[in-house]
Amino acid sequence: MDSIKKKMMAMKLEKENALEKAINLENQLKEKAKDFEKKEEEMNDWLSKVKNIQTEVDTVQESLQEAISKLEETEKRATNAEAEVAAMTRRIRLLEEDFEQSSGRLTETSTKLDDASKAAEESERNRKTLETRSISDDERMAQLEEQVKEAKYIAEDAERKYDEAARRLAVTEVDLERAESRLETSESKIVELEEELRIVGNNMKSLEVSEQESLQREESYEETIRDLTERLKTAEQRAAEAERQVSKLQNEVDRLEDELLSEKERYRAISGELDTTFAELTSF
């Protein structure tokens, strides 16, 4: 009877120990489950950070590409403006040459007109002189008449030359007015081009500053990309480490669950054995 009681006490103690161990294992399992959830949350946080870093890298690269495109477009516009300025400069030079030629023709026409006027005045003076003289000699008269005819011819020729010179002068004046109008237009265009050139110069300076700033931003972007890439690698390493920790915790949880199941089986076996022992005692 004492041996049965001792056995019962031992079994009861073993049952209590098994129950306590099962409770401890269950508590450990809960702690491991909490650690598992915590590690899983950390892993999710790191994955979210990795995605954010990747998004930030993509945004920086897009901004860098956009800045490069704007710089290329600005350089293209500056090149077109310089070509237009060069074309207008050539046109102005041609207009100046045309104006110089027109001025030369006008000077030549004025000289010829002066010569014709002097010849006409000289003929008129000769004619008046001949008219005031009283010459009875027929030969002298004939000579004078011939001189008068010649003078008239010279006067008529001078008048024709004068008319022709006047006509050419009028045409030249019209050409000169047109040339002056074109010159004024050219001067106005030159002013506009100088203003555009000044603006282009300012824009070029701004572009140089923008290019320097773009280079600085590009260097900053490259440094940021390197930093983000390094952070991404670190985050990936930590995420991989977190996954390994989670896997390790999962294995530990599986082991504890197996131990808990084993202890529960052992507890049921001890309980069955106690029930059998109590039944035997009751039968006595």
From Swiss-Prot:
Pfam families: Tropomyosin. The keyword Transmembrane helix does not apply. Residues 101-110 have a biased composition (Polar residues). The keyword Coiled coil applies. Keywords: Coiled coil, Repeat. Transmembrane segments: none annotated. Residues 111-140 have a biased composition (Basic and acidic residues). Residues 1-284 form a coiled coil. It comes from the Eukaryota. Residues 97-140 are annotated as: Disordered. Tropomyosin, in association with the troponin complex, plays a central role in the calcium dependent regulation of muscle contraction. The molecule is in a coiled coil structure that is formed by 2 polypeptide chains. The sequence exhibits a prominent seven-residues periodicity. Homodimer. Belongs to the tropomyosin family. This is Tropomyosin. The lineage of its organism: Eukaryota, Metazoa, Spiralia, Lophotrochozoa, Platyhelminthes.
